Amino acid sequence: MHEVRVLAFQKIYSIDINQSAMDDIFDIFSIEDKGLDIENESIKSFYSSLVNGTFNNLEYIDSLIKDISWNWSLDRMDKVDLAILRMGVYSLKFQNFENSKRALIDEAILIAKKYGSKNSDKFINGILDALLKNMENCIEKK
C-alpha cells in the first residue's frame, strides 16, 4: 500500500499548494501510472480514506502538529513536509493499521526521503514519534 500512500500524499500536497477543491480526488492517471488496479475497491477506499480523512480532520490534525512542533508554525514548514505530516498524523490517530504504529511512521519517513528536502525525514520522524509517544502515554494513564 506504499504506492497508494505516495499518491495520497501527492494529492494532499497538490490540493494545499494549489488551494484547489477536492472535487476530483481520485486521479486515475496517477493510479494507472503506478501500475495499481483502479477497479480494486480496497485501493480506492484506502486512497479516499487518506485524502478525505486528512482534510475532514485538518483543523484537529494541524492543532496536533502545532502542539508538537513547538517553535515551528505551519506557515514556516515546507509544504511537502506538512503534507506528509498531515497524512501521517491522520493515519496514527484515525486509521486501524494491521502492523505497528511505528510502521506508519516508517512509511512517512520513506516518502520524506524521496520527496522532501535534506532533513525532512528527521523532522517528520521527530514530530510523528513525539505524537506516538503522547498517544501511548495517554493510553497508559487510562
From Swiss-Prot:
One of its GO terms (biological process) is transcription antitermination. The keyword Transcription applies. Signal peptide: none annotated. InterPro entries: NusB-like_sf, NusB_fam, NusB_RsmB_TIM44. It holds the Pfam family NusB. It comes from the Bacteria. Keywords: RNA-binding, Transcription, Transcription antitermination, Transcription regulation. The keyword DNA damage does not apply. GO terms for molecular function: RNA binding. One of its GO terms (cellular component) is cytosol. Belongs to the NusB family. Involved in transcription antitermination. Required for transcription of ribosomal RNA (rRNA) genes. Binds specifically to the boxA antiterminator sequence of the ribosomal RNA (rrn) operons. HAMAP family: NusB (MF_00073). This is Transcription antitermination protein NusB. It comes from Borrelia garinii subsp. bavariensis (strain ATCC BAA-2496 / DSM 23469 / PBi) (Borreliella bavariensis). The lineage of its organism: Bacteria, Pseudomonadati, Spirochaetota, Spirochaetia, Spirochaetales. The gene is nusB.
